[in-house]
Curated annotation (Swiss-Prot):
The active site is at D313. Signal peptide: none annotated. Its main location: cytoplasm. Monomer. PROSITE patterns: EPSP_SYNTHASE_1, EPSP_SYNTHASE_2. The gene is aroA. This is 3-phosphoshikimate 1-carboxyvinyltransferase. Pfam families: EPSP_synthase. Pathway: Metabolic intermediate biosynthesis; chorismate biosynthesis; chorismate from D-erythrose 4-phosphate and phosphoenolpyruvate: step 6/7. One of its GO terms (cellular component) is cytoplasm. 3-phosphoshikimate binds at K22, S23, R27, S169, S170, Q171, S197, D313, N336, K340. It catalyses: 3-phosphoshikimate + phosphoenolpyruvate = 5-O-(1-carboxyvinyl)-3-phosphoshikimate + phosphate. Catalyzes the transfer of the enolpyruvyl moiety of phosphoenolpyruvate (PEP) to the 5-hydroxyl of shikimate-3-phosphate (S3P) to produce enolpyruvyl shikimate-3-phosphate and inorganic phosphate.
Length: 427
């Protein structure tokens, strides 16, 4: 297996313009495909997940052109639900941001489409979404294991009264929200359980509004959506920088700044993961906000005990930042980590122990006490981009760290290690 050893880093300084947000990129692509008119998307993320969405749209007859660097996409909308000419199988890798929204959108009208992906995708639950779509009339079959992909979709979704479990993934609700306006009937969506990663629902609602559709949101417990609507292209749309990707650089600034400035997100960002900067501030770093930037300056870091339900992806970065904080850090209400690219709670606990931390892994929490000195270790990444990027921070000590399968960052940030090196002064 390929590996990358990062030597100790004495200081991190400078600015980075972030690649486009994965969450925003894939939502914007799907809405542009469903909309009337042509949309020009700029600062689109070039990553595995986005390529899977683009390949699927192409197979469904959507025409688009990409710039040479794949960050600008001119896409001609279908002016309504996507149609397959004949039976079709779409391979979506391990892209949850493609699988969940497409599973819903392709239940409109009469299609026969199979959605499948990598082995890990077949372990990521989708049963709550399928249950909700069936309540709205959709015909869906599980082809292997009950409640998991691959799925066969045969249309039939018309809307109506629907319940969705919000406790596992907000992507299920996102998928229903984006699909419901195109259903023939009005839809009332009721959320059961505590809604995880609520800020991601705000991204969805924001983007739908940009494409001309507004829905009634009753305290995130009930959403009322008029049927028979159309999305309309906004013309041009700039994809915000990825706030989850910003977390690694901001944390590096907190641990070994200098000052690190990330551009492409700021106080006006719609992504909940910008709140990661507030957590660093609580830990002792100095944060400066602009409309389209966030800067972080080193501080003496101390442990925190916090509910991280609102920023589950960026919270992973706090787990490795905790190695540099005084005291024991506890991250709570993060069960959602278990159903991501890998079981992130298990993976994080396992790899933190390798570098010497004392770790308690609970059902939905993790407690981390740093060692007096970090140990060199070979870090397993579990084909999870965030594991690779989180553990790069170990090099901000006086100990090297070896990252196994470093290219797994291609899911959201193909040149992450080059960018980190550019801003780093070796010890």
């Amino acid at each position: 297996m390929e590996s990358l050893t990062l030597q100790p880093i004495a200081r991190v300084d400078g600015a980075i313009n972030l690649p486009g947000s994965k969450s925003v990129s894939n939502r914007a692509l799907l809405l542009a495909a469903l909309a009337c008119g042509k949309t020009v998307l700029t600062n689109l993320l070039d990553s595995d997940d986005v390529r899977h969405m683009l390949n699927a749209l192409s197979a469904l007859g959507i025409n688009y052109t990409l710039s040479a660097d794949r960050t600008r996409c001119d896409i001609t909308g279908n002016g309504g639900p996507l149609r397959a000419s004949g039976a079709l199988e779409l391979f979506l890798g391990n892209a949850g941001t493609a699988m969940r929204p497409l599973a819903a959108a392709l239940c409109l009208g009469q299609n026969e489409i199979v959605l499948t992906g990598e082995p890990r995708m077949k372990e990521r639950p989708i049963g709550h979404l399928v249950d909700s779509l069936r309540q709205g009339g959709a015909n869906i079959d599980y082809l292997e294991q009950e409640n998991y992909p691959p799925l066969r979709l045969r249309g039939g979704f018309i809307g109506g009264d629907i319940e969705v479990d919000g406790s596992v993934s907000s992507q299920f609700l996102t998928a229903l929200l984006m699909t419901a306006p195109l259903a023939p009937e009005d839809t009332i969506i009721r959320v059961k359980g505590e809604l995880v990663s609520k800020p991601y629902i705000d991204i969805t609602l924001n983007l739908m509004k940009t494409f001309g559709v507004e829905i009634a949101n009753h305290h995130y417990q009930q959403f009322v959506v008029k049927g028979g609507q159309q999305y309309h292209s906004p013309g041009r749309y700039l994809v915000e920088g990825d706030a989850s990707s910003a977390s690694y650089f901001l944390a590096a600034g907190a641990i070994k700044g200098g000052t690190v400035k990330v551009t492409g997100i700021g106080r006006k960002s719609m992504q909940g993961d910008i709140r990661f900067a507030d957590v660093l501030e609580k830990m002792g770093a100095t944060i400066t906000w602009g409309d389209d930037f966030i800067a972080c300056t080193r501080g003496e870091l101390h442990a925190i005990d916090m509910d991280m339900n609102h920023i589950p992806d960026a919270a992973m970065t706090i787990a490795t930042t905790a190695l540099f904080a005084k005291g024991t850090t506890t991250l709570r209400n993060i069960y959602n980590w278990r159903v991501k690219e890998t079981d992130r709670l298990f993976a994080m606990a396992t790899e933190l122990r390798k570098v010497g931390a004392e770790v308690e892994e609970g059902h939905d929490y993790i407690r981390i006490t740093p060692p007096a000195k970090l140990h060199h270790a070979d870090i397993g990444t579990y084909n999870d981009h965030r594991m690779a990027m989180c553990f790069s921070l170990v090099a901000l000590s006086d100990t090297p760290v070896t990252i196994l399968d470093p290219k797994c960052t291609a899911k959201t940030f193909p040149d992450y290690f080059e960018q980190l090196a550019r801003m780093s002064t070796p010890a």
